[in-house]
Amino acid sequence: MAAKKVVKQIKLQVEAGKANPAPPVGPALGQAGLNIMEFCKQFNERSKAQIGLKLPVVITVFSDRSFTFITKSPPAALLVKKAIGLETGSPTPHTHKVGKITRKQLEEIAKTKMEDLNANDIDAAVNIIAGTCRSMGVTVEA
């Protein structure tokens, strides 16, 4: 049997354990002709351990209207905000600092994000996360 033909890839950010047919999930999957409730059930089951976090998900749609999906780790900015208890980052990150983060906290976040980052080792991953912190107005402590 030949491999199924990929028709489309859909990228969404959905809150873990709370996928439902309402926007943004419903319209995006409906346009591709997918069974929305089937995706919601599978996604909620697979992501129930990470409730409360927004997870990026890449849905691959095939020509026979079947699908597969991959959940990725939460965005770095979301993990940084959660680690230091922020609501939002700074509107002017270079002049107005909104918090501080330690190297240990950066390493925890980097370990979580490691599989999705373009980094060879933990130090490179920490530097990537530190850059995200600086662009949010968070001071990185040595």
From Swiss-Prot:
GO terms of biological process kind: translation
GO cellular component annotations of the record: cytosolic large ribosomal subunit
PROSITE patterns xref list: RIBOSOMAL_L11 (PS00359)
GO molecular function: large ribosomal subunit rRNA binding; structural constituent of ribosome
Taxonomy, superkingdom: Bacteria
Keywords carried by this UniProt record: Methylation, Ribonucleoprotein, Ribosomal protein, RNA-binding, rRNA-binding
Pfam families membership: Ribosomal_L11 (PF00298), Ribosomal_L11_N (PF03946)
Post-translational modifications reported in the UniProt record: One or more lysine residues are methylated.
Self-association state and partner proteins as the record states: Part of the ribosomal stalk of the 50S ribosomal subunit. Interacts with L10 and the large rRNA to form the base of the stalk. L10 forms an elongated spine to which L12 dimers bind in a sequential fashion forming a multimeric L10(L12)X complex.
Family per similarity comment: Belongs to the universal ribosomal protein uL11 family.
Free-text function comment from the UniProt entry: Forms part of the ribosomal stalk which helps the ribosome interact with GTP-bound translation factors.
Name of protein: Large ribosomal subunit protein uL11
Protein source organism: Leptospira borgpetersenii serovar Hardjo-bovis (strain JB197)
